[in-house]
């Protein structure tokens, strides 16, 4: 009994101390756990806050870039509009000047109208295989008076490289036509006539005379 009591009285303080220490450790651990949880939540909140702020900054930068891009695009578009408007003005000015020249070129248009009639007669003669009749209209060479007057009209009314190119093509084809007709070469005459008439029609289209000359 005494031994039992001794053991009991000896062990109780040890168990009490152990239990007390264990409870303190549990409380301390619980406290540390709560502190760690609080710290973890705090860090998460900070991370979320920083992430949100970073997103706002990124959105702001993108918005600024877009605004700058839109502003630059607006400036370029305005420049394009001004260039287009200036081009329209220049084209209109050229058309007015060209029309004034055409309206005043009464004599030159008369020369060109005579050319239309001659080409029509030559075309009919070639179609009928009547090259002598075509030769009477054309003459013997390109140094005839009507060819000279036609080229005077070409020179006065041609204002662009494209128009001058068609004049050169016409004169070259006309020379071939006169030569072929005088040689009584029907096939070459047909080809040369088509080339001459085509070049002249293109020239009248470029100069704006297509609607002013009869028979085209």
Curated annotation (Swiss-Prot):
Chloroplast found in the keyword field: yes
Signal peptide annotation: none
InterPro entries membership: MPH2, MPH2_C
A cellular-component GO term for this protein: cytosol
GO BP annotations listed: photosystem II repair
One Pfam family linked to the record: MPH2
Taxonomy, superkingdom: Eukaryota
Transit peptide endpoints, chain numbering: 1-38, 39-73
Statement: the UniProt record of this protein carries the keyword Transcription regulation: no
Keywords, comma-separated and alphabetical: Chloroplast, Plastid, Thylakoid, Transit peptide
Subcellular location: Plastid, Chloroplast thylakoid lumen
PANTHER family: THYLAKOID LUMENAL 16.5 KDA PROTEIN, CHLOROPLASTIC
Official protein name in the record: Thylakoid lumenal 16.5 kDa protein, chloroplastic
Organism: Arabidopsis thaliana
Taxonomic placement: Eukaryota, Viridiplantae, Streptophyta, Embryophyta, Tracheophyta
């Amino acid at each position: 009994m005494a031994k039992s009591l001794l053991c009991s009285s000896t062990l109780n303080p040890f168990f009490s101390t152990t239990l007390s220490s264990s409870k303190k450790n549990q409380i301390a651990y619980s406290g540390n756990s709560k502190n760690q949880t609080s710290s973890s939540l705090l860090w998460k909140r900070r991370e979320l806050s920083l992430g949100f702020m970073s997103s706002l900054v990124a959105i702001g930068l993108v918005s600024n870039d877009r605004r700058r891009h839109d502003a630059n695009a607006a400036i370029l578009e305005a420049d394009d509009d001004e260039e287009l408007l200036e081009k329209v003005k220049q084209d209109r000015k050229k058309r007015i000047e060209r029309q004034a020249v055409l309206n005043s070129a009464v004599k030159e248009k008369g020369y060109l109208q005579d050319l239309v009639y001659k080409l029509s007669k030559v075309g009919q003669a070639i179609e009928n295989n009547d090259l002598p009749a075509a030769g009477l209209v054309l003459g013997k060479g390109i140094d005839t008076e009507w060819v000279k007057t036609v080229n005077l009209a070409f020179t006065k009314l041609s204002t662009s490289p494209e128009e001058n190119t068609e004049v050169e093509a016409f004169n070259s084809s006309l020379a071939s036509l006169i030569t072929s007709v005088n040689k009584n070469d029907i096939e070459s005459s047909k080809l040369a006539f088509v080339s001459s008439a085509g070049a002249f029609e293109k020239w009248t289209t470029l100069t704006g005379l297509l609607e002013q000359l009869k028979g085209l």
